Structures are given as structure tokens and as C-alpha cells.
């Protein structure tokens, strides 16, 4: 099980939580870390001591009930974004257990307006953007994005 502290919990820098079984951990490949002069099992590339403290502080501050409510809202909004993209015929991809929705990249104007992250992947149809549906993403903000995407679809006709 893995969870992004950055993309789900909103921590201001990349970090994550990874839970595994002892068998998987014990059978993981080791990597030679030249600057440590040692072989190590590496699940993540960071050894920051601050990020786990931020993660712990957030977990304790918000609490189980708070995170349960936030997770429900995040996934509700993720499903809403997907249903709206489907409704306007805009291609998208998403793992049902993820709050990241990847979709065909819109115009540069829309990318700038919403500060969309962009990339390319031939397997998914070329130029892409994605939205990470977090606590600050609302149905109103999704509706505004969808309206702009719909306008692009109409202007393409």
C-alpha cells in the first residue's frame, strides 16, 4: 500500500507512506549507494527527517475522522471530474484508487489558466495534462475547467 503525502495529504514537498509485508521487504533488490559505501534496500530516494515529522504532525492534527471525511470528499470530486470529462467526450485515464486524473492536454491558454501539469506518453495518446484532486479542489472549480474544455471541443467542430 502506498500513499503520497504530497498528492493526497497536501504536504508541501514530496513524501510518502509505503506499507509492505516482511516477505516483500526481505526479497527486495538491493542497490549500491556509492556515497554511503553500502548496499541498501531502497524504497524511496529520500532520507529527509523533516518530511516524516510533517506527515506525523498532519496525521495527529487532522485525526482519523478528519482524514476519513477528506478522503471521501476527494474521491467524490475525483469521480465527479471523471464523469464530467466523460460527459463532454474528453479522453481521460484514472486508476479507481487514485485521486490523479490524466487527460488529453487542452490548449496552452487552458493549461496556463489552471496551471496544469503537462507531459507526453505515446501509450496514452500523446500530449497529456493531469489534475490531482486534493482538498482545495471543489465541484465549482471542476465545473469551470469542464466549461473551458467543452468550449474547446465546440470550437474544434
Model-predicted segments: where are they?
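C-terminal, non-catalytic "cap/extension" segments appended to globular domains
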Residues: 71, 79, 111, 124-125
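Residues in well-ordered beta-strands of folded domains
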Residues: 2, 19, 56, 102-104, ...
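PLP-dependent enzyme catalytic core of the Aspartate aminotransferase-like
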Residues: 123-157
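Active-site C-terminal subdomain of aminotransferase-like
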Residues: 1-95
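Generic non-transmembrane alpha-helical segments
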Residues: 80, 84-88, 109-115, 148-156
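Generic structural signal for hydrophobic core residues of well-folded globular domains
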Residues: 58-62, 105, 149-153
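Conserved PLP-binding catalytic core of the aspartate aminotransferase-like
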Residues: 89-115
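Conserved PLP cofactor-binding pocket of PLP-dependent enzymes
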Residues: 95, 99-100, 116-133
